[in-house]
């Protein structure tokens, strides 16, 4: 019997979208529960460590976006062929998480003075550094982020790209031809194209 899936997350793409991409690619039906802000106080105590996204698999709760994505990648043939390739995938996904954290450090800063000071280093140093490096990695891997083939790392990156772009206030791959081609490649997959066409529209 096929497992049942229920994703619990707020009504945005962000860290829930890699999971939605992977479930769609795996042609799995899933309940996409998007709670509203007012629902969170009652929902939070039932979530592991009080955070989302949470993916229930046959009623069993799993959490942490990267861990869930890694699991789904294995389920759907998107992991490495050996430990070395899986290390390559994990390294690049962890680096994507570092990049996200650097942008989020600016975006979520509630102190406007502090936020202003972070803007120039982010735009002139951090973003160009990471996007150039990622572009070089994709070029060296034959058009992919790791292992020279399509893996869950590619889905993870493309799925959170709208979120990263929203926080950074720019299209991060616009001037990086290999990253841009990777985005088009993933979004062009029939299952992903179908998901993107039917998902609720959100900015991030």
Curated annotation (Swiss-Prot):
Residues 3-80 form the GST N-terminal domain. The keyword Transferase applies. This is Glutathione S-transferase. PROSITE patterns: GST_CTER (PS50405), GST_NTER (PS50404). Keywords: Allergen, Transferase. Residues 82-204 form the GST C-terminal domain. It catalyses: RX + glutathione = an S-substituted glutathione + a halide anion + H(+). Belongs to the GST superfamily. Sigma family. It is an enzyme of class 2 (transferase). GO terms for biological process: glutathione metabolic process. GO terms for molecular function: glutathione transferase activity. Glutathione binds at residues 9, 40, 44, 50-52, 64-65. Its EC number is 2.5.1.18. The keyword Disulfide bond does not apply.
